[in-house]
Amino acid sequence: KGASYESGLDNTPMYDGVEFDTTKNLLKIQDVGLTGLYVMDCEALAYMARELGQEDAYQELAGRAEKYKKAMQALWDDNFGLFLNRHTDGKQLSKRISPTNFYALNAKAATQEQAERMMKEHFYNPEEFWGDYIMPSIARNDTAYTAETYWRGSIWAPMNLLVYWGMQNYELPQAKDDLSEKSKDLLLKNWLEKGWVRENYHAETGSYNKRSEHFYHWGALLGMIYLVENG
């Protein structure tokens, strides 16, 4: 449980039943989202290192980013049309999916064709992430989905922002526009009805959620997506 909390996703169903390696103190899973963020982090640090004239640090960080970006292709399931987490004990890919599966786009690990499939088959799939309010923190057709139980369905602004940032790396104009519009609408719905900028949002009603602070700084990221998209 503690290891899953270190992901920042607390009670996400993605890690339910995943074995814990007591030797390495790690969950036995290769995670698309965390790997995508690691690559993104390495690229940002590499840029900073080059600007500061630290060429050795730049080479190391850029090399790490490229290594793991290429390795992420092993997590692509061509039948399913998405990058999937992989259990390291049996090597099987996990079909429990969340917005973090889109973070392969943040690492630029996907081809344009793969990115388009991810949008068509999953982002716009009403059984998974599409709907009046998006994006739920676990696919709507997951057995653990409840729409309002923290990371088991609730909508979180940082997830929307990270998916949007990933989309920016590809030619996905309609998906970017749709995500920005729905994010803005979700923010304004709560602000106009209650004057709230919430920690997270109910994935079916778009409003009240028992496990959510009424005011939380990252809720405003929903509006930031719209402002960036409309420049």
Model-derived regions, located:
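Conserved hydrophobic/aromatic pocket- or pore-lining residues that grip, position, or stack substrates
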Residues: Y38, A65, A104
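Extracellular S/T/G-rich loop segment that most often corresponds to the catalytic His/Ser-adjacent loop
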Residues: E128-W130
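Short amphipathic alpha-helical coiled-coil/interface segments
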Residues: Y58-W76, S180-S183
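Generic detection of long, well-ordered alpha-helical segments
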Residues: T35, E55-Y58, A62, E113, ...
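C-terminal capping/lid segments that line or modulate ligand- or cofactor-binding pockets
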Residues: D77-P126, T143, E148-G231
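The feature captures the catalytic groove of carbohydrate-active enzymes
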Residues: K1-Q59, G90, I138-L162, Q168-N169, ...
